[in-house]
Amino acid sequence: VYVPRAPHHGLKDGKQHGKVRASELVKFMSDSAGLVSGLGDELGVIGHSGGGTLATWLAQYGDGLFSRVLLLSPYYEPDASQVPKWQVALLRNVYGNHLLPDQFFDGALSYRALANYVIVKQNYRNDLKAVGLKHVGLIIGSEDRLIDSTMARDIAEKMAKNSGATLTNETTPAHMGIGHELIWPGDKSVKQYKKELYDMYVRVYER
């Protein structure tokens, strides 16, 4: 298992991720793919939120390296309740190119970082085809109102179909009350249902 840290992420100053650029993310993904290429006969990639954005890119541009992908509430664009659709291009162009001072959603998520992940998504293959991909797993929290869940399902379905891969698309059980935080152990619901959730992730990945 290889768990890399994305550029400017995971630092003591939680706002440093706002410095990230799409070009840095692409280099990070390419370097990571090179590091894991010799780890085994079958490789998979798992990503949550922005990590799901990157996992989708790796599946398509990994030259057949990854046969499985698990997308946990992947962030391709914000839900319309967070950012109206007509503003997404503005977010991508203005904040993605660092033309305005950064702002932080809920005091934590950088607009600039969010915009650069959208830029990565904009550079997916038109047909979303991923050579060598055998299975796509998608899990979205039942109470997740941060991501465009319809887009997440559409991208996962199209990538699976055009790659000749199987697809497992599930939503966490409503009684768990899981939102966007599918893996953070500090989340109350994740902590309460940790075993059930992690069993679900393994099952959907391996199906």
Please report, for each region that a protein language model flagged, where it lies by residue.
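Gly/Ala-rich beta-loop-alpha elbow adjacent to hydrolase catalytic centers
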Residues: 46-51, 55
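Conserved alpha/beta-hydrolase
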Residues: 1-13
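Serine-hydrolase catalytic core
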Residues: 109-179, 190-202
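Residue-level signal for short, function-critical loop segments
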Residues: 49, 75, 142-144
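Second-shell loop/turn segments in exported
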Residues: 15-23, 102-107, 140
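Hydrolase active-site cap/lid region
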Residues: 66-115
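Catalytic nucleophile-loop/oxyanion-hole region of alpha/beta-hydrolase
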Residues: 11-39
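Active-site signature of alpha/beta-hydrolase-fold catalytic machinery across serine-
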Residues: 57-61
